[in-house]
Amino acid sequence: GGEKRRAAIAGVIAMNPEVLVLDEPTAGLDPMGRDVLLSQIVQYHKERKNTVILVSHSMEDIARVADKIIVMNKSNLVMFDKTKEVFSKGRELEKIGLRVPQITKIMLELREKGFDVPEGILTVDEAMNCISSLLDKEGKIW
């Protein structure tokens, strides 16, 4: 899915804009289409070093690709920081109607229950590494 959208984005990229602004580029795409498109956006940024501004309500997408995040609420700038820093403020984000990535929320809840997990876990791989370090050889949490 998303061939027309990818073709449209490719047409814009061919013009080599200094700043590429994408508004909800993954909306309505199936998971595979979303993964392909996000990978292409990341690759474009790495190769050309151009600025990419991604507007999205999908915090999972933002967590996967963004270096920095601007959070707006009612036309006001609420936060501007590195991705891990913004998502470590999950409760503040929830107050303005934004959700952190699901895995970040789970890790935040573990932290609030007293488990020694760091803030800013954004991916399943990071969470697995963190949780496995909490387990003993028998698979029990200390």
Segments (PLM) and residue ranges:
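A short, proline-enriched helix->beta-strand linker immediately N-terminal to the Walker B motif
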Residues: 14-18
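Catalytic Walker B motif of ABC-type/P-loop ATPase nucleotide-binding domains
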Residues: 20-23
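Helix N-cap at the start of a conserved alpha-helix in ABC-type nucleotide-binding domains
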Residues: 31-33
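Helical segment within the ABC ATPase nucleotide-binding domain
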Residues: 35-47
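H-loop/switch region of ABC-family ATPase nucleotide-binding domains
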Residues: 56-57
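A short, surface-exposed alpha-helical micro-motif characterized by mixed small hydrophobic
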Residues: 62-64
